[in-house]
């Protein structure tokens, strides 16, 4: 039996009339009460959408941020598990719970939404995680560009890494928060400062290429036919 596919890039043209190749900005580990609003502000300034892979445990306290993402009309809320465990260490039932409970939390915060594409914490995928994604009729989403912004390499390093690595169909990994077990008291305001600074330079540079930035919302939809690699 063939294992379910893992999406690292999106191939194929979007039928939006622009004729420009696509690119996908994604953010992991939020929503964060200070970092996520700043990232949303930058995206709004440049009229750019993004896909946010959220941690379910945060949603009860940060439901207004999820509602803002939805209200702005073009962002996607996706699934980064309930507590951000290494799923390769989890029994199959726990893997299912991590994904399904996060889907429920997302739907509670944004009623009317469908099942959310999952992304495995740390990018560690197992056959069980891929099966759980397929059973939920979603695509397991990885990435093709990772500037390791979580390690705070400097805003310029983040910008350079992204711009040197992107190509049409690329899925870019950035972070707007951090896992629950990595939260450091007193560091909230500066947590993703480098990512926020870098994003203000990355978006205009991508537009100059030119590349069109989209969400992953319509993957697999007849409205938006694409080939998945």
Curated annotation (Swiss-Prot):
The record marks 149 as: Raises pKa of active site His. InterPro entries: Glyco_hydro/deAcase_b/a-brl, NODB_dom, Nodulat_NodB, Polysacc_deacetylase_ArnD. It is found in: Cytoplasm. PROSITE patterns: NODB. Keywords: Cytoplasm, Hydrolase, Metal-binding, Nodulation, Plasmid. The keyword Metal-binding applies. GO terms for biological process: carbohydrate metabolic process. GO terms for molecular function: hydrolase activity, acting on carbon-nitrogen (but not peptide) bonds; metal ion binding. It is an enzyme of class 3 (hydrolase). The active site is at 28 (proton acceptor), 175 (proton donor). Pfam families: Polysacc_deac_1. GO terms for cellular component: cytoplasm; membrane. Residues 21-214 form the NodB homology domain. Its EC number is 3.5.1.-. It comes from the Bacteria. Is involved in generating a small heat-stable compound (Nod), an acylated oligomer of N-acetylglucosamine, that stimulates mitosis in various plant protoplasts. NCBIfam families: nodulat_NodB. This is Chitooligosaccharide deacetylase. The lineage of its organism: Bacteria, Pseudomonadati, Pseudomonadota, Alphaproteobacteria, Hyphomicrobiales.
């Amino acid at each position: 039996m063939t294992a379910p596919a893992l999406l690292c890039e999106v191939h194929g043209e979007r039928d939006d009339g622009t004729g420009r190749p696509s690119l996908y900005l994604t953010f992991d580990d939020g929503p964060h009460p200070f970092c996520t609003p700043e990232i949303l502000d930058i995206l709004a300034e440049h009229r750019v959408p993004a896909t946010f892979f959220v941690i379910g445990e945060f949603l009860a306290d940060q439901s207004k941020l999820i509602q803002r993402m939805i209200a702005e009309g073009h962002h996607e809320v996706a699934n980064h598990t309930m507590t951000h465990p290494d799923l390769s260490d989890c029994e199959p039932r726990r893997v299912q719970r991590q994904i399904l409970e996060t889907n429920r939390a997302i739907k509670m915060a944004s009623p009317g939404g469908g099942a959310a594409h999952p992304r495995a914490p740390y990018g560690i995928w197992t056959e069980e995680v891929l099966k759980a994604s397929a059973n939920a009729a979603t695509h397991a989403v990885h990435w093709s560009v990772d500037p390791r912004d979580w390690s705070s390499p400097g805003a310029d390093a983040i910008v350079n890494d992204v711009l040197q690595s992107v190509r049409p169909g690329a899925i870019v990994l950035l972070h707007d928060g951090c896992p629950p077990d990595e939260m450091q008291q007193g560091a909230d305001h500066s947590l993703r400062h480098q990512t926020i600074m870098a994003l203000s330079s990355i978006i205009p540079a991508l537009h100059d290429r030119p590349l069109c930035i989209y969400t992953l919302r319509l993957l697999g939809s007849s409205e938006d036919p694409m080939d998945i690699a």
